[in-house]
Amino acid sequence: QESTVIVMLTRVNENGRRKCEKYWPDHREQTTFDNLIVSSINVSEYGQIIKRSFQLWNPNQPGKKLLVEQFHYITWPDHGVPITTSDLFNLRRMVIESQGNNPSPIIV
Protein backbone atom coordinates (compact mmCIF):
# COMPACT_ATOMS: atom_id res chain seq x y z
CA GLN A 1 0.00 0.00 0.00
CA GLU A 2 3.11 2.19 0.05
CA SER A 3 2.31 3.91 3.34
CA THR A 4 4.79 6.66 4.12
CA VAL A 5 3.81 7.56 7.70
CA ILE A 6 4.04 5.39 10.83
CA VAL A 7 2.79 6.52 14.24
CA MET A 8 4.14 4.67 17.28
CA LEU A 9 2.56 5.28 20.68
CA THR A 10 4.51 2.93 22.95
CA ARG A 11 8.06 2.60 24.15
CA VAL A 12 10.09 -0.46 23.22
CA ASN A 13 10.66 -1.20 26.93
CA GLU A 14 8.77 0.04 29.95
CA ASN A 15 9.36 -0.84 33.59
CA GLY A 16 11.76 -3.58 32.52
CA ARG A 17 9.20 -5.23 30.22
CA ARG A 18 9.34 -5.49 26.44
CA LYS A 19 6.34 -3.64 24.95
CA CYS A 20 7.09 -3.99 21.23
CA GLU A 21 9.79 -5.01 18.79
CA LYS A 22 12.31 -2.48 17.53
CA TYR A 23 11.79 -3.01 13.83
CA TRP A 24 13.92 -0.07 12.66
CA PRO A 25 17.70 0.20 12.30
CA ASP A 26 19.77 2.59 14.39
CA HIS A 27 20.57 6.01 12.94
CA ARG A 28 22.66 5.79 9.75
CA GLU A 29 22.45 1.99 9.82
CA GLN A 30 20.49 -0.39 7.63
CA THR A 31 18.85 -3.77 8.04
CA THR A 32 17.25 -6.30 5.72
CA PHE A 33 13.90 -8.08 6.06
CA ASP A 34 13.55 -10.77 3.38
CA ASN A 35 13.85 -8.72 0.15
CA LEU A 36 13.37 -5.32 1.78
CA ILE A 37 16.26 -3.09 2.81
CA VAL A 38 15.53 -0.43 5.45
CA SER A 39 18.05 2.38 5.84
CA SER A 40 17.82 4.99 8.61
CA ILE A 41 18.60 8.40 7.16
CA ASN A 42 17.58 10.86 9.87
CA VAL A 43 16.51 11.08 13.53
CA SER A 44 15.16 14.27 15.14
CA GLU A 45 13.74 14.86 18.62
CA TYR A 46 10.87 17.25 19.30
CA GLY A 47 10.07 17.17 23.02
CA GLN A 48 8.42 13.81 23.65
CA ILE A 49 8.34 12.90 19.95
CA ILE A 50 11.11 11.24 17.97
CA LYS A 51 10.86 11.55 14.20
CA ARG A 52 12.76 8.91 12.24
CA SER A 53 13.15 8.90 8.47
CA PHE A 54 13.83 5.69 6.58
CA GLN A 55 14.40 4.75 3.00
CA LEU A 56 13.00 1.38 1.93
CA TRP A 57 13.77 -0.52 -1.25
CA ASN A 58 13.81 -3.95 -2.79
CA PRO A 59 17.14 -4.75 -4.47
CA ASN A 60 15.18 -6.72 -7.09
CA GLN A 61 13.39 -3.49 -8.09
CA PRO A 62 16.21 -1.00 -8.66
CA GLY A 63 15.24 2.63 -8.84
CA LYS A 64 12.11 2.26 -6.72
CA LYS A 65 12.71 3.67 -3.22
CA LEU A 66 10.15 4.75 -0.64
CA LEU A 67 10.72 7.42 2.01
CA VAL A 68 8.92 6.56 5.27
CA GLU A 69 8.65 8.75 8.37
CA GLN A 70 7.99 7.30 11.82
CA PHE A 71 6.63 9.51 14.60
CA HIS A 72 7.35 7.93 17.98
CA TYR A 73 5.52 9.39 20.98
CA ILE A 74 7.70 8.20 23.85
CA THR A 75 5.77 9.13 26.99
CA TRP A 76 2.39 7.43 26.72
CA PRO A 77 2.01 5.71 30.10
CA ASP A 78 1.61 1.95 30.34
CA HIS A 79 -1.76 2.47 32.03
CA GLY A 80 -3.95 5.54 31.60
CA VAL A 81 -3.49 8.57 29.39
CA PRO A 82 -0.85 11.32 29.09
CA ILE A 83 -1.04 14.07 31.72
CA THR A 84 -0.89 16.88 29.15
CA THR A 85 -2.09 17.07 25.56
CA SER A 86 0.35 19.58 24.04
CA ASP A 87 2.75 16.91 22.73
CA LEU A 88 -0.18 14.92 21.32
CA PHE A 89 -1.37 17.97 19.40
CA ASN A 90 2.19 18.48 18.12
CA LEU A 91 2.29 14.82 17.08
CA ARG A 92 -1.00 15.19 15.21
CA ARG A 93 0.23 18.32 13.41
CA MET A 94 3.51 16.66 12.42
CA VAL A 95 1.74 13.57 11.08
CA ILE A 96 -0.73 15.64 9.05
CA GLU A 97 2.11 17.72 7.58
CA SER A 98 4.10 14.61 6.71
CA GLN A 99 1.12 12.84 5.14
CA GLY A 100 0.19 15.82 2.96
CA ASN A 101 -2.02 14.73 0.07
CA ASN A 102 -0.73 11.16 0.07
CA PRO A 103 -3.78 8.85 -0.15
CA SER A 104 -1.98 5.85 1.40
CA PRO A 105 -3.01 4.85 4.94
CA ILE A 106 -1.17 5.96 8.06
CA ILE A 107 0.14 2.99 10.05
CA VAL A 108 -0.50 3.19 13.81
From Swiss-Prot:
What residues does substrate bind to? Answer: D78
The answer to keyword Disulfide bond applying to this record is no
UniProt lists the gene as STY-5
Query: Which EC numbers characterise this protein's activity in its record?
Result: 3.1.3.48
The record's keywords, sorted A to Z, are:
Hydrolase, Protein phosphatase
> What is the native source organism of this protein?
Styela plicata
Q: Which family does it belong to?
A: Belongs to the protein-tyrosine phosphatase family.
What reaction(s) does this enzyme catalyze? O-phospho-L-tyrosyl-[protein] + H2O = L-tyrosyl-[protein] + phosphate
* Residue ranges annotated for the Tyrosine-protein phosphatase domain, each copy included: 1-108
Q: GO molecular function: any one?
A: protein tyrosine phosphatase activity
The enzyme class is hydrolase
Q: What is this protein called?
A: Tyrosine-protein phosphatase 5
* Keyword set includes Hydrolase: yes
Q: Pfam families under this entry?
A: Y_phosphatase (PF00102)
SUPFAM superfamilies listed in its UniProt record: (Phosphotyrosine protein) phosphatases II
